[in-house]
Amino acid sequence: MKKADILVLDFGSQYTQLIARRLREQGVYAEILPFNVSLADIKAKEPKGIILSGGPASVYATDAYFCDKGIFDLGLPVLGICYGMQLMAHHYKATVAPAGHKEYGKANIEVKKDSALFKNLPKKQTVWMSHSDKVENLSQGFEVLATSENSPFCVFGNEDKKFFALQFHPEVQHSEFGKNILKNFAKYACNCESVWNMGSFAKTQAEKIREEVGNDKVLCAVSGGVDSSVVAALLASAIKEQVIVVFVDNGLLRSGEKEQVEFMFKNTLGIDLISIDASEIFLSRLANVRDPEQKRKIIGNTFIEIFEEEAKKHKDVKYLAQGTLYTDIIESSVVGASKTIKSHHNVGGLPEKINLKLIEPLKEIFKDEVRALGLELGLSKEVVYRHPFPGPGLAIRIMGEVNRPSLELLRKADVILLEELKSTGWYDKTWQAFCVLLNVKSVGVMGDNRTYDNAVCIRVVDASDGMTATFSHLPYEVLENISRRIINEVEGINRVVYDISSKPPATIEWE
């Protein structure tokens, strides 16, 4: 079992993943586990500290979430955040009750006592609150470390046990010294060293791949995106002669994607590529299918069928490698009290029984870590910083049924969007940009004639790891040019709208 410096127990907060991200950014390997993980599994990870995340429940409610009480007897430092704070207070018989004044948003705190958490940090800080319950008193052995206007027990702790509790969320960017607080907990309370980096990760993963695969061969599924490209490069660095790289054209690719992928692997990466045209199979199976989850399942099942058929053509192929990320695992499964958001085609979209063993060497890291790993492996910045493209492709960017006419409309609009973003310098400033065909028609006027054509939505977002995102504040003139070109150049589209939703509550992709 892989060891972790810090274990984050998930009680359902939308920010849980950010806790792990902030620690990893500082070289400390953090891993997320469900709140009800067994004490034996925790011990097996040999952590140096534990963090209890926030969550939507109340510790005094009948449906409250509780971790194993033995966590507090392991002799490890523990940090409780929001719900985790209240859980710690509740465990030690302090009073937790509904807050008369709920706090959502920015608040100011003042440090009242020196502690490991606030070492080398200012006494007054701006933090981000998101709670409707409060701690009303402290148990023996605990003392106040910081206060806010509405929270006299905003931060408390027991320095001897190295137990600390925060009412606010240090993991979000709005807490100006939040990252430093988490770093201090890891460094001064848990004695963690900053040794986690992509160089060490690449070396460790290569060793694991060689050990697991032995003399067998691996079928590596690639899409041309950064995730699968990095997987292919990592496998090539570990077992180059045993890797068979396969690209499947599922008919759901962007304009020119197939040609770009074939060129990139052959000329940029120096990796032989088997290219399979399976567009007819995918599109026929997607005919008349409107439900997004069903689309994902069909695509996942079909991919596996094709890969298994290809594997039969090669001797000793026992494994299938995929570019599954930590975010895919989180969004496709129930982690602690968190709910499934959507099934990813390479996680929840897989059939229950497949004839190949899965290798997912990136499943422990986030997207920005994948990019850093790609550079570590020698991939070009052009490859590493391509915008993410979902495995199900354009199928989840078409609302409702997927067919060739709809795909053609979407491809043409998407080409224009990307051309305009690249020509104005906005492509490299944003995380992801694409068009969504809404399959909704509206009335328009072109010349003196009435039109009744499709509407397309532009989605451009800023993010660092894809777990959260905000819409990009593109200049009006850029948006205007994109809209004008799409309406004038793509017959069948007469309306363009811009998606100004953030994640959460929306996801980046529409389906």
From Swiss-Prot:
<dbReference type="InterPro" id="IPR014729">
    <property type="entry name" value="Rossmann-like_a/b/a_fold"/>
</dbReference>
<comment type="function">
    <text>Catalyzes the synthesis of GMP from XMP.</text>
</comment>
<dbReference type="GO" id="GO:0005829">
    <property type="term" value="C:cytosol"/>
</dbReference>
<protein>
    <recommendedName>
        <fullName>GMP synthase [glutamine-hydrolyzing]</fullName>
        <ecNumber>6.3.5.2</ecNumber>
    </recommendedName>
</protein>
<dbReference type="InterPro" id="IPR001674">
    <property type="entry name" value="GMP_synth_C"/>
</dbReference>
<keyword id="KW-0436">Ligase</keyword>
<keyword id="KW-0315">Glutamine amidotransferase</keyword>
<feature type="domain" description="GMPS ATP-PPase">
    <location>
        <begin position="196"/>
        <end position="386"/>
    </location>
</feature>
<comment type="pathway">
    <text>Purine metabolism; GMP biosynthesis; GMP from XMP (L-Gln route): step 1/1.</text>
</comment>
<feature type="active site">
    <location>
        <position position="171"/>
    </location>
</feature>
<keyword id="KW-0547">Nucleotide-binding</keyword>
<dbReference type="Pfam" id="PF00117">
    <property type="entry name" value="GATase"/>
</dbReference>
<feature type="active site" description="Nucleophile">
    <location>
        <position position="82"/>
    </location>
</feature>
<feature type="binding site">
    <location>
        <begin position="223"/>
        <end position="229"/>
    </location>
    <ligand>
        <name>ATP</name>
    </ligand>
</feature>
<dbReference type="InterPro" id="IPR004739">
    <property type="entry name" value="GMP_synth_GATase"/>
</dbReference>
<dbReference type="InterPro" id="IPR022955">
    <property type="entry name" value="GMP_synthase"/>
</dbReference>
<dbReference type="GO" id="GO:0003921">
    <property type="term" value="F:GMP synthase activity"/>
</dbReference>
<dbReference type="GO" id="GO:0005524">
    <property type="term" value="F:ATP binding"/>
</dbReference>
<dbReference type="InterPro" id="IPR017926">
    <property type="entry name" value="GATASE"/>
</dbReference>
<feature type="active site">
    <location>
        <position position="169"/>
    </location>
</feature>
<feature type="domain" description="Glutamine amidotransferase type-1">
    <location>
        <begin position="5"/>
        <end position="195"/>
    </location>
</feature>
<keyword id="KW-0658">Purine biosynthesis</keyword>
<dbReference type="Pfam" id="PF02540">
    <property type="entry name" value="NAD_synthase"/>
</dbReference>
<dbReference type="InterPro" id="IPR022310">
    <property type="entry name" value="NAD/GMP_synthase"/>
</dbReference>
<keyword id="KW-0067">ATP-binding</keyword>
<dbReference type="InterPro" id="IPR029062">
    <property type="entry name" value="Class_I_gatase-like"/>
</dbReference>
<comment type="subunit">
    <text>Homodimer.</text>
</comment>
<keyword id="KW-0332">GMP biosynthesis</keyword>
<dbReference type="Pfam" id="PF00958">
    <property type="entry name" value="GMP_synt_C"/>
</dbReference>
<dbReference type="InterPro" id="IPR025777">
    <property type="entry name" value="GMPS_ATP_PPase_dom"/>
</dbReference>
